[in-house]
Amino acid sequence: MSRSVETAGVLLITVPAIEFGGLSLLKFMAARTPGYMDNPMRQGLFRAGHAHAGVLVLLALVALLYLDEAALSDGVKDVVRLFIVAPPILMPAGFFFSVTSPAADRPNKLIWLVYAGAVALAVAAVTLGVGLLRAG
């Protein structure tokens, strides 16, 4: 089994955690939870975290399908593999953990995780894209 297939298996195991996050948001809305319903900053960042988790896991799964076909060295493939699976963890974590306080009116310093995930995603996407073009 290739490392990309193993990584995809691990990513698929994270899907229930994303579902749990969505269920939590639904409960916050249904119960009109104070600290969520009365805090637009928290609502926005929690929603962004949940959305990014789902979309980035799907993007990572698709990218992993192509990684083994790219004209890249094994070491570079390992870096791409790491950098393509880091954003679905880093970015949602940054969105959620930057507004842990129900009274937060702006993100705390943990918002840097969002930027770190974005950089990792850009590096992985461009590197994989170039590797695929070179292989073609």
Predicted region positions:
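Polytopic transmembrane helical bundles with strong interfacial aromatic enrichment
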Residues: 1-136
